[in-house]
């Protein structure tokens, strides 16, 4: 979604006396940060909470290798279509997350979540 689209939806809600959006579920993590350009500034301006899905980028921010040995990791076409195209450059970020996890004696996932909370994310959506 583009920023102007979200803004227009807020105007439509206001003009029709509907409840405006207070939370937005968006795709946002250390490997995918497109929303920082338009949407997140509008969310901040309008006091809208962020609830990103895929905070661990399909598991890529939870392990120091790109490939997963799980059945899902081998067959999940959605994760592959979202992330595999930029594997080479994204692995640089994954390596940094791994280094920080070692430095602070914690899990890579904790670093990824801490980054989101530092960016103002109210509640990342995770599925176990």
Regions found by a protein language model. Give the residues of each.
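Glycine-rich beta-alpha junction loops
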Residues: 2, 28-32, 54-61, 115
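Structural preference for beta-strand elements that scaffold enzyme active sites
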Residues: 19-25, 47-51, 122-124
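Aromatic-lined glycan-binding groove of carbohydrate-active enzymes
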Residues: 35-72, 107
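Conserved short secondary-structure transition element at the edge of the structured enzyme core
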Residues: 55, 85-128
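Hydrophobic packing residues within well-ordered alpha-helices of enzyme cores
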Residues: 6-9, 43, 123
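Glycine/proline-rich, positively charged
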Residues: 1-38
């Amino acid at each position: 979604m583009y920023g102007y689209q979200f803004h227009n939806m807020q105007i439509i809600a206001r003009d029709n006396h509907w409840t405006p959006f207070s939370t937005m579920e968006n795709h946002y993590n250390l490997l995918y940060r497109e929303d920082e350009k338009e949407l997140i500034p509008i969310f901040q301006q309008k006091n809208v909470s962020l609830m990103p899905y895929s905070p661990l980028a399909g598991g890529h921010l939870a392990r120091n290798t790109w490939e997963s040995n799980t059945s899902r990791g081998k067959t999940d076409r959605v994760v592959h279509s979202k992330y595999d195209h930029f594997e080479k450059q994204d692995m640089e970020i994954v390596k940094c997350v791994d280094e920080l996890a070692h430095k602070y004696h914690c899990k890579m996932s904790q670093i990824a979540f801490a980054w989101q909370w530092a960016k103002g994310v109210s509640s990342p959506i995770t599925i176990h």
